[in-house]
Amino acid sequence: MSVHEQHRPSLESRPRHDTIELGALTRRYFAHDFEGQAHARNVARLTVRLGKSFALPRQDLLAIAVGATLHDVGKLTVPAAVLETPGGLTSEEWQVVKSHPASGDLLVSPLVRHPIVRSAIRWHHERVDGRGYPDRLRGSEIPLPARIVAVADAYEALIAARPYSTPCSPAEALAEIVDCAGSQFDPECVRRLVEIDRSIETRGIEQTRAFATAVTCNNGAGLPRFER
């Protein structure tokens, strides 16, 4: 059985009140971390492209896109002043930031039980060498959706324009991620990232845009329909 088959739930409608609450939670996070909104959508778009390269089924692509959009929702528990710090963080501040994957999982747990969504939120900072957080998973212990989001998250963070840092070029970002293949990132996910050209912003964007923005539409009513 493939990894994505292990994570595929039976499809059922989610209760409408949970859908609305999840949409509200997403908007709260985007209001708390304004830069996080563009980052979340860019990560979701790239995640879908990577997921398609693994031939994930459509419903799994929907779920991984929701997880990617919400991957940093736990930063709601991180003070805005810490998120907006222009320089390096203190050790105490860094520990607070590192808590966001587990905090995000806790925030969405009453609303979503889908394993792909939950794994993307909780485990996108795990490393294949076992030195990540929050649970220090190693290699294939990290579900494929989380390994995919980890690569997309890092790439988009490296090329993002921020007031306090100079973005990498796509080539520089890709080179840095390739250097970390096998230690921080799944080598197969990295290989597929290398194969994806920068047509992300042109060819196929209309197909992936709906995945990336679903959780913010119509009070969350545009969320994919899957078993919680």
Model-derived segments and spans:
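Histidine- and acidic-residue-rich, metal-dependent catalytic cores
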Residues: 4-8, 12-228
